[in-house]
């Protein structure tokens, strides 16, 4: 048992492989697990085990994602790999598997391709903070100059989408060659095979270049209100799950969204009918609020540390629109479409005022299955921040999912 306890002392980081179809994302994922399995720090996974990704549902959308876990000397990782391009788009937009950093896989034989570009853009828009590049299939390219050109092209593309193209580590290797060596000799250690060493080199880069994320408990307090009731003689209680941060009795919080923002003091905290000194991220709590009437709080508001979040009505977002087969709309929609936007705990009506495609063109309409950037105007202000996820609903069913990329008003 001591061992399991020791493992939990390592910081946990969520990563994933992104990049164009057939550039070797899944092969690389398999190579990483097999390489680290030789150190007893992962369970080796075959390509077909990862490729047969289980279905998940996130914000009403079915996504195929495979999760593997492994550790290095420094950290414990959860790694997500999606089989299809559409699954990546959906996963990144819904945040089904939130990534603290990603490994961008680019085939040296092909260079950056359309999905390479799209995944970099998505990573930027949905807030994946850092990328490391694995230049794969270098065994198929004899020309050093060609490799340097491909690297240059990748760095320019990264810079174009506001990643630090000049400093991002690019590791050259061959996931397939490393995998073949590990399959031939599963005990291969560092220093025994040049291709396997490239996998170690990649993991060193991931360890050092992708920062350890700030834990949710260390972020400013936020709780979306799910329910409200009053306790005779004591006041009004708002219940919900603490999304981030921590809260103690006596602290000041703001009620944000739907109405004028107002301040109040926490006079009591309860969890499972017991009083609590401090609530932390992940707890489902009841918060007793001083001087607030039951009719002044409603579902859809948030309780937050003062001055950390503000109410807004207009924003830009990256959106995936569900296909008919996914339970989405059967017909396209046009600018002026007015669905519900489900944010945290509530639906708010809003108008989609305009949309643009990736290349900056303005399509006349949005078809089921499309990914677009859209500008939204809500009829009521609610607490919104960049990187926040939401669902688009119509008559109670999900027709799209999105992430806020920019606040306008």
From Swiss-Prot:
Gene3D superfamilies: P-loop containing nucleotide triphosphate hydrolases (3.40.50.300), Translation factors (2.40.30.10). It holds the Pfam family GTP_EFTU_D3. GTP binds at residues 19-26, 81-85, 136-139. Residues 81-84 are annotated as: G3. GO terms for molecular function: GTP binding; GTPase activity; translation elongation factor activity. Residues 10-214 form the tr-type G domain. GO terms for cellular component: cytosol. Its EC number is 3.6.5.3. It is found in: Cytoplasm. Mg(2+) binds at residue 26. Residues 174-176 are annotated as: G5. Keywords: Cytoplasm, Elongation factor, GTP-binding, Hydrolase, Magnesium, Metal-binding, Nucleotide-binding, Protein biosynthesis. It comes from the Bacteria. Residues 136-139 are annotated as: G4. It is an enzyme of class 3 (hydrolase). Residues 19-26 are annotated as: G1. InterPro entries: EF-Tu_GTP-bd (IPR041709), EF-Tu_GTPase (IPR050055), EFTu-like_2 (IPR004161), EFTU_2 (IPR033720), G_TR_CS (IPR031157), P-loop_NTPase (IPR027417), Small_GTP-bd (IPR005225), T_Tr_GTP-bd_dom (IPR000795). Residues 60-64 are annotated as: G2. It catalyses: GTP + H2O = GDP + phosphate + H(+). Belongs to the TRAFAC class translation factor GTPase superfamily. Classic translation factor GTPase family. EF-Tu/EF-1A subfamily. Monomer. GTP hydrolase that promotes the GTP-dependent binding of aminoacyl-tRNA to the A-site of ribosomes during protein biosynthesis. This is Elongation factor Tu. The gene is tuf.
């Amino acid at each position: 048992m001591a061992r399991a306890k020791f493992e939990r002392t390592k910081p946990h980081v969520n990563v994933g492989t992104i990049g164009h179809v057939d550039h070797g994302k899944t092969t690389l994922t398999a190579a990483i697990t097999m390489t680290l399995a030789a150190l007893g720090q992962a369970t080796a996974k075959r390509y077909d085990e990862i490729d047969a990704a289980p279905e998940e549902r996130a914000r009403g959308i079915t996504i195929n994602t495979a999760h593997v876990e492994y550790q290095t000397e420094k950290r414990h990782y959860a790694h997500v790999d999606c089989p299809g391009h559409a699954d990546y788009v959906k996963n990144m937009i819904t945040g089904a598997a939130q990534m603290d950093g990603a490994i961008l896989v680019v085939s040296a034989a092909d260079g950056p391709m359309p999905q390479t570009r799209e995944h970099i853009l998505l990573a930027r828009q949905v807030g994946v903070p850092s990328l490391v590049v694995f230049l794969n299939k270098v065994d198929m390219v004899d020309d050093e100059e060609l490799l340097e050109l491909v690297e240059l092209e990748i760095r320019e593309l990264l810079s174009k989408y506001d990643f630090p193209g000049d400093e991002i580590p690019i590791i050259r290797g061959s996931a397939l060659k490393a995998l073949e060596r590990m399959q031939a000799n599963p005990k291969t250690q560092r220093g025994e095979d040049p291709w396997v060493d490239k996998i170690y080199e990649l993991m060193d880069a991931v360890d050092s270049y992708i920062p350890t994320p700030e834990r949710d408990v260390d972020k400013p307090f936020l709780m979306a209100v799910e329910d409200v009731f009053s306790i005779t003689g004591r006041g009004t209680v708002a219940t919900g799950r603490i999304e981030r941060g921590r809260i103690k009795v006596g602290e000041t919080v703001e009620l944000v969204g739907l109405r004028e923002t107002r301040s109040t003091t926490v006079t009591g905290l309860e969890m499972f009918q017991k009083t609590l000194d401090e609530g932390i991220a992940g707890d489902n709590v009841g918060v007793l609020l001083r001087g607030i009437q039951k009719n002044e709080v409603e579902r859809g508001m948030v309780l937050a540390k003062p001055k950390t979040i503000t109410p807004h009505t207009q924003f830009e977002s990256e959106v995936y629109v569900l296909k008919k087969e996914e339970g989405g709309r059967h017909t396209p929609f046009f600018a002026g479409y007015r669905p519900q936007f489900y944010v945290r705990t509530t639906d708010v009506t809003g108008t989609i005022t305009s949309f643009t495609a990736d290349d900056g063109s303005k399509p006349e309409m949005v078809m089921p299955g499309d990914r677009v950037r859209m500008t939204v105007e809500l009829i009521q202000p609610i607490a919104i921040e960049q990187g926040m996820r939401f669902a688009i609903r119509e008559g109670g069913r999900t027709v799209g999912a999105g992430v806020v990329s920019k606040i306008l008003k």
